[in-house]
Amino acid sequence: MSLLLLVVSALHILILVLLFVATLDKSWWTLPDKESLNLWYDCTWNTTTQTWACSNVSENGWLKAVQALMVLSLILCCLSFILFMFQLYTMRRGGLFYATGLCQLCTSAAVFSGALIYAIHTEEILAKHPSGGSFGYCFALAWVAFPLALVSGTVYIHLRKRE
């Protein structure tokens, strides 16, 4: 049982790390000329000063929805981890981790919705930028976090506390 709890906790921490990097790092979309777009800033590599020059992203409504969903997924994932620890130490033997599992399933839904909106509305979000480019690693990390959170939520729902 302790090995299962360790694996579930490690999976949850992995999901948290993936969500933090996907939400806060600077590569949701990369353009050929070393320009990188994330949820918060539009960054261009300045070759003369060897630094990143960043400005705020556009006020696109779809991008605001993606920002809100990714932040919501982070909050829900943190909440479910805190709830899991609370339930682990206070719940009676034989109890199920329904609340934790439900929070993780909501995390999964929020990540899925955010990444899907970004994928579908990329042209509208990037309307002021030159054509070309590809999805960055932060976008891929969001898609990796989605099934992991889904599996984690399902495991929590079926997990019973044992002595």
From Swiss-Prot:
Pfam families: PMP22_Claudin. Keywords: Glycoprotein, Membrane, Transmembrane, Transmembrane helix. The chain crosses the membrane at residues 4-24, 66-86, 100-120, 139-159. Gene3D superfamilies: 1.20.140.150. Glycans are attached at N46, N56. It is a multi-pass membrane protein. GO terms for biological process: apoptotic process; bleb assembly. GO terms for cellular component: plasma membrane. Belongs to the PMP-22/EMP/MP20 family. This is Epithelial membrane protein 3. The gene is Emp3.
